[in-house]
A protein has these predicted regions:
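Binuclear metal-ion centers of metallo-dependent hydrolases, dominated by the metallo-beta-lactamase
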Residues: 176
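Short beta-to-alpha loop/turn elements within the nucleotide-binding domains of ABC transporters
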Residues: 168, 180, 186
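Domain-scale signature associated with acetyltransferase and cell-envelope carbohydrate enzymes
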Residues: 1-164, 172, 188, 197-221
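Short linear motifs in intrinsically disordered
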Residues: 61, 181-182
């Protein structure tokens, strides 16, 4: 889907899609889905996007990628962003699955990754071989041997330069403080800060459908 976007997109005779006025000259990848009123920002965000999935990236209704966020994927990576979400200069690194649901907000410099490449998880010989293979790959992408899916539930706010590590699920309505390193699952409506992240309090769950409908009624008079 590429109609009724927040940015005009033109299709060339060869089928390539370009964002009108984009400062970066590359076309958008063919295997991404942009819902109505979505704001992809720039094709620069996809310079390290190597997903071979039928739909390797989806940006939901009225969601936006702002400030030159970057989406780095391996051939099996799949990034899904729900409705009314804001990604502000966010880096997503995905070899398996990163899912961001509706009404989420990511502040500038935040990072989400579903992959590990550390000295503790791979031997020097294995890492050396992976580097050799990447050097001869057209994409230069190093595939993680053990990616772990990341799930961000509805209405989550992530502060600037926070890092969400592989295998983490963040529950609905949670807040992640700036520069927090999230290493384990976060309960719904928890406020998490620090390195490693720890819960310091819980919020009242006011983002219910009943409250939402009441606010809409008030706004519409």
């Amino acid at each position: 889907m590429h109609e009724h976007l927040a940015q005009p997109v033109r299709e060339t005779s060869s089928g390539d899609l370009f964002i009108e006025g984009d400062w970066f000259p590359n076309p958008l990848p063919a295997n991404i889905s942009l819902d109505e009123m979505a704001y992809p920002d720039t094709s620069y965000s996809f310079t390290t996007f190597f997903s071979e999935k039928p739909v390797g990236f989806s940006l939901g209704y009225a969601s936006g990628n702002y400030g030159h966020g970057v989406f780095t994927t391996g051939k099996n990576g799949e990034i899904n962003v729900g409705k009314f979400a804001v990604l502000q200069c966010t880096r997503i690194i995905c070899d398996l699955s990163v899912t961001i649901k509706d009404h989420c907000m990511f502040s500038w410099g935040s990072v989400i990754t579903d992959r590990w490449l550390t000295a503790n998880t791979l031997s020097p010989d294995v890492r050396r071989q992976m580097l050799k293979e990447a050097a001869h790959s057209p994409t230069r992408h190093i595939e993680s041997p053990d990616p772990q899916a990341v799930l961000i539930e509805d209405n989550v706010w992530v502060g600037f330069e926070a890092v969400i590590l592989p295998g983490v699920t963040i529950g609905q309505g949670a807040i992640i403080g700036c520069k927090t390193i999230v290493t384990e699952d976060v309960p719904p409506y928890a406020v998490v800060v620090g390195n490693p992240g720890r819960v310091i309090r819980f919020l009242d769950p006011t983002d219910t459908e009943e409250n939402r409908q009441q606010l809409i009624s008030q706004l519409l008079g």
